[in-house]
Amino acid sequence: MRVVIQRATSAEVVVEGRTVGSLTTPGLVVLVGVTGTDTATTAEKLAEKVWGLRILSEEKSASDLNAPLLVVSQFTLYASTRKGRRPSWSAAAPGPVSEPLVDHFVTHLRSLGAHVETGIFGADMKVGLVNDGPMTILIDTDDWH
């Protein structure tokens, strides 16, 4: 799995003109991508890492501050630009594989005590945020091996 975490003072996800998820207080926007080798265990470990990552004010974590998270699925995190000018998405897991893992990631965050807002899987989403810092972190679970 890959996540891009952005510290934000506010954020929202809009689908078909309707806000479906938002941060109204400072927190984290988490873009999540899934590949074919990811498992429920991967999702749980990544959720724990994100929840405990000390990147908020005064080197505190979202867990320390009970800061909200806005989780948005994003298969494009697995884009390959190795050949030509058109990205390939072949490393991204297909929807029937990735949607349950993104859901498991969100469910595990909630079980840890996180307030989690989400986008809508597979929808055309408009994501807006005010990046605080800016602070943007990339985590790829393949780097853990």
UniProtKB/Swiss-Prot annotation:
Keywords linked to the UniProt accession: Cytoplasm, Hydrolase, RNA-binding, tRNA-binding
Q: What Gene Ontology cellular-component terms does the record carry?
A: cytoplasm
Catalysed reaction equations from the record? glycyl-tRNA(Ala) + H2O = tRNA(Ala) + glycine + H(+); a D-aminoacyl-tRNA + H2O = a tRNA + a D-alpha-amino acid + H(+)
The GO terms describing molecular function are: D-tyrosyl-tRNA(Tyr) deacylase activity; Gly-tRNA(Ala) deacylase activity; Ser(Gly)-tRNA(Ala) hydrolase activity; tRNA binding
Domain topic, free-text comment = A Gly-cisPro motif from one monomer fits into the active site of the other monomer to allow specific chiral rejection of L-amino acids.
Q: Which family does it belong to?
A: Belongs to the DTD family.
Task: Supply the name of the protein.
Answer: D-aminoacyl-tRNA deacylase
Q: Gene encoding this chain?
A: dtd
